[in-house]
Amino acid sequence: MSALRRDLDDYLVIRRALGFKLERAGLLLADFVAHLEANETDPITTDAALAWATLPPNGASDWWAQRLAVVRSFARHLHAIDPTHEVPPPGLLPGRSHRATPYLYSDSDIAALMAAARGLRSPLRAATFETLVGLLAVTGLRIGEALRLDRDDVDLVDGVLVIRLSKFGKSREVPLHPSTVDALAAYTRERDRLCRRPVDRAFFVSTAGTRLLYCNAHLAWLDLVRRAGLQPRSVTCRPRPHDLRHSFAVRTLLGWYPDGADVHARMPLLSTYLGHVHPGNTYWYLSAAPELLTLVVARLDATVGAPA
């Protein structure tokens, strides 16, 4: 093992101990180190970093910028230990940050998705995806969090989900509405009736009795969207599973404003419920829907007075 590869292993261990998963970054950096080894380059140089970051030659500039950003973080770590490693300066490969426009689901959209799930040929598959869609809609869970749920993580007595080692390695408890508990209990009975010999302890199972894989769940989602007749609203606004999370947050905020609630004081509660590390990530939802912006402006006008 080369010194650079050992350095990479140490870097990933340290960063992951701090809560960063670095799944994609770990793969990219392993490829970067392999590139340096193949070209017998050590220490890291800006030229070598640029040469690797701009692969493939016909790649998108945004992708090149992301690749270089991953290298810069690793290079900063090494430079602090050994100053012979160069840190590529920022701005060498400027890329634009494209944040997808949230597809905010209406109640009828969610009902259409659940109806589409009920129409699936396999009774187990139908029950699984109808319940999964409903759970994402009423809790704002990340789809990966829902797929990783074990049976022991779903407490139907106290009405609580235990989300273990989610994004940034955080765990949390998510309280459930009684109607959600009833729906999960109904799925549990149906799942156990249709799948008498599950392969593992997953709460949501495939027709083979195994835990649902994200890639398969994503393909199933695309099928449900098609069956439900949901259409993209723009090139950057397509119905994605993660947008159920956006929709939950926006609906929660929309419910607070008419009640006259102190939204700023309640934001940390929503952040904790959603599993956000930084409240700023939750504040982003204020700009996610025109209805929210209208309510924010109205609240400001009522507080400081409308302009003359």
Give the ranges of each region predicted by the language model.
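Conserved catalytic core of the tyrosine transesterase superfamily
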Residues: 1-308
